[in-house]
Amino acid sequence: MHVRISVAALSCAALLAACGGNDSRTTSDASVPVRGGTLTAVVPQPGPCIDPQVTGTDPQVIVAHQVLDNLVFENNTGEVQPWLAKSWTISPDGLVYTFTLRADVKFTDGTPMNAAAVKANLDRVLDPKIQSLADAIYLVPILKSTEAVGDFVLKVNLKKAYAPLLHFLAQAFIGIQSPAGFSRGREANCQDPIGTGPFKIQSFTPNAEVRLVRNDNYNSPPPGSQNTGAAYLDRMVLKVVSDPAVAYAALNSGEADVIHSPLPQSWKTIKKNANQRLLSQVRPGTPNVILLGVAKAPLDDVRVRQAISYAGNVRAALKGAFLDEMKYEAGPLSSATSDYMAASENAYEYNPAKAAALLDQAGWTGRDANGYRTKNGVQLKFQLYYSLQANATAPDVTLLENMQSYLKQSGINLVLGQGSATEVYSMIAAGSITAVKGYSGIAGWYWPTNTPDVLRLMYTSDGLRAKTNLGGYSNPELDSVLTKAAVTQDQQQSQALYIKAQQMVSDAALSIPMYPATSRLAYNSKVHGLTVDHALGLPNFYEVWIAK
């Protein structure tokens, strides 16, 4: 949720985001790495705390990912590999995971990374005072207890089997921290989480910058790394710049070496600039969607939701708004997610005739003076929340306006409501889109996560209980399919279940997919070795070096 209302959600935080587009994963050209230097990167505002176990947002973990290592690593094919844990076993019933840890790794405060330390991290997840949304959603419902059965052997006992567990443990939200840091108290640890990673926090100025220095003793690089020791950079400065236009100007002037989420209007220019590069990678989880509140009329009728999907012509609306720079994503899961259903790509192609037939069947047969359909004298309309804060862009708004125009042609009144962050937080707190007066949909909602289990959290009764199913949908058959998938260790069986679930979610038209949530970084051509991780789509600076 890693909206994460995602947990992200709240990362998501359901704000219209400038993520998406080029699906290709690129890295900077590499020759012989050069050691030394300071890299300045513009990143999103991480808030007053950079401990990813507290709250848990994307901006937090961009920082934490440079400081903390994880028990396990997820490579670019979605395979889970050893990292701080060099091996593990899973009991036949899926209730006990036993991890054997590396014995040669220390935190940057000099204390050992051992079973007791990892136990302290997982036990901390259960502390409600920590208020981690990511951990609360994924781990609290399943984690029963932990036991250090040796100096470097940890046993994790679950309340119920959870097949995606290893994938979640690869996310930076559960990066392993020094228990000595925890002993300082929640607020102190917020300013300086201590890890085993390639960098350590030098200073943190909320709303301004985070300064990192190299961990000269680093010896635990993730699998597949070309570098085997300390990072190439001496230090990094992660600057907060709220205005994307100002961030782009900083890249052009040389004040910044890397900027996060450049404006869509700048993508073509960056690609043509011999001194700049653009790295793009689709994030797993969900694409950017219009999430629909299905508990109230008129969206409680599946025929109306399907008609909207057929009549909105998202493909054309997207092309017109982003000038062919953004790929359309048609399914409930991102194409970068394991068990993605490729057949989704053909769902809900523009078909106003089919939309008209569905609306006729649903009883919306009248017309008012403005040409909108009516039923019993009531106009067919729904109000969509969107925000012009943070990374929202002009093309995002144009996309919605284009859809609004197409829907009007079919007699559907899409009312665009520019809302505040307070309103979306109210929806999240209540666990319902319709909790905020007037709204029946959220534009720009996405949930980056590396497991298709996100469908269970967003669209089932489990999600209603956890307040992560903001659309309010409930279907016992879908509940059964996704609950079974979450406990199934057999990959072929779980894949079949997730594909079935995707088809059910698509058929029910619970959201309107738009474009993929994409990690996009623009950087100076002197920067080499920049990559994006697969688990959450976070920038990796460990192997970055700057040409002289």
Where are these regions (language model features)?
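Detector for C-terminal structural segments
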Residues: 205, 209-210, 311-342, 353, ...
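Gly/Pro-rich hinge or "lid" segments in bacterial periplasmic/extracellular proteins
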Residues: 170-237, 352-353, 357
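Structural transition elements
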Residues: 199, 293, 328-368, 389-398
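N-terminal lobe/hinge region of extracytoplasmic solute-binding protein
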Residues: 42-92, 123, 194
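Surface-exposed binding/hinge segments that line
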Residues: 100, 135-181, 198-205
